[in-house]
Amino acid sequence: VELARQLLASAGLDEIWFVVSPQNPFKRAADLLDDEQRLKMVELALEGEPRMHASDYEFRMPRPSYMWHTLQSMSRDYPDRRFVLLIGADNWERFSEWYAWRDILSHYRIVIYPRGGSAVDAASLPEGVSLVDTRLIDISSTQVRQFIAAGRPINGLVPDSVARYISDNGLYAPK
């Protein structure tokens, strides 16, 4: 959420939609929680953030979810909006592996934010792609899951409401 606040301030955005993806083509479906649980955690994290919205838009789309299809569909459904793709530097490093990545590049603005272990050369970015200068927040969902599996507290890694939801529902706990 802190990163999203920084992006709102530095990237010239009106709002940020967190589109929960039911099936990322780069991840195994078995590794993901139930769609509704993941959406609920995003909703909890965004409470009190009027310019941030949790979206289940991809829940109604074919799986796996391809960003090109999502952006095209959202642009048709919301013609008064201009969508910008926000991705971490780690995703930018693999962007040429994405379905229809050239189409995304030619039709949508892309904003890249720093991620630990990934470096992006701002001078080499194509037109329409920018690197924002935000404070590095080196927390990943993988790290949160590893902490939980090891029985370590996740306070400070996720909002308290999300930590409570994870604990109350036994999510990511060792089996």
Question: Predicted regions span which residues?
Answer:
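Nucleotidyltransferase catalytic core that binds NTPs
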Residues: 1-175
